[in-house]
């Protein structure tokens, strides 16, 4: 989207699963996790790399590390975190992640993100917590959450956690300097909060997903795809684009393209 217009879009021809994560790289390529696989495509929609999950497994979150590596979490029994070289297709690093319900892949993970320190924040949906791991899989920090969906590390070292209750900014000590609940903006109903992002202004953008199988914008009047609020929770901007020419559909994830290159991150020694 640029200036309120859709300038590029992609419909997965396979269409096998829900898209839960998508990242645009600085070269215009897009890496996305689509439940039963991970794919990177060019701006002209050619597949650069693709991975299909084995039966009984799912992938809902993936991120680039440099131009040649991808980190993703594969739900299943066992659930694993992998770093793959997409040039050689070799798995260069793998860690087993503990889950509460190993035989229920769908509800294990939806989102993870790398920190500036080269660690990984993981939202454990089925274990009701957010955990920070180092490169070797050692747990460095954790915080309880109610079926956490999104986790966003902040430059100040704090973490934005999005769960069933709302959004909380959590410090390393476990303090909560800021929080948001759907009741804070009653004019804009939320059905399922997904993720949150802190803007340079200090405002926070929160996105909302409509379950297209059982609910629609028509029977959820006022539903938004995203909302921007100030630290005082005043509404700055609302995204409600359900109809042509900019029919965006349910919003699982957002990316602000003016920020740093998505691939300029590291996981331990891997850049």
Predicted regions and their residues:
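Histidine-/acidic-rich catalytic cores in large beta-rich domains
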Residues: 1-271
């Amino acid at each position: 989207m640029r200036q309120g217009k859709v300038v590029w879009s992609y419909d997965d021809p396979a269409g096998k699963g829900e898209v839960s994560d998508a990242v645009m790289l600085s070269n215009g390529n897009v890496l996305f996790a689509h439940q039963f696989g991970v794919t990177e495509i060019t701006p002209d929609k050619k597949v650069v790399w693709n991975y299909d999950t084995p039966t009984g497994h799912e992938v809902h979150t993936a991120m680039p590390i440099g131009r040649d590596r991808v980190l993703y979490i594969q739900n299943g029994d066992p659930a694993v975190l992998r770093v793959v070289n997409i040039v050689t297709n070799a798995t260069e690093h793998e860690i087993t992640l503990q889950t509460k319900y190993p035989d229920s892949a769908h509800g294990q993970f939806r989102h993870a993100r790398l920190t500036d320190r080269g660690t990984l924040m993981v939202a454990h949906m089925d274990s009701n917590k957010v955990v920070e791991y180092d490169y070797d899989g050692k747990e460095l920090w954790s915080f309880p959450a109610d079926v956490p969906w999104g986790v966003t590390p902040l430059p100040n070292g704090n973490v934005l956690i999005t769960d069933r209750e709302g959004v909380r900014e959590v410090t390393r000590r476990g303090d909560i300097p800021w929080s948001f609940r759907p009741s804070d903006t009653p004019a804009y109903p939320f059905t399922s909060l997904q993720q949150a992002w802190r803007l340079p202004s200090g405002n926070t953008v929160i996105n909302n997903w409509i379950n297209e199988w059982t609910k629609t914008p028509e029977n959820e009047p006022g539903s938004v795809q995203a909302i921007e609020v100030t630290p005082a929770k005043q509404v700055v901007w609302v995204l409600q684009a359900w109809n042509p020419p900019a029919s965006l559909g349910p919003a699982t994830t957002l990316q602000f393209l003016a920020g740093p290159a998505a691939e300029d991150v590291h996981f331990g020694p891997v850049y």
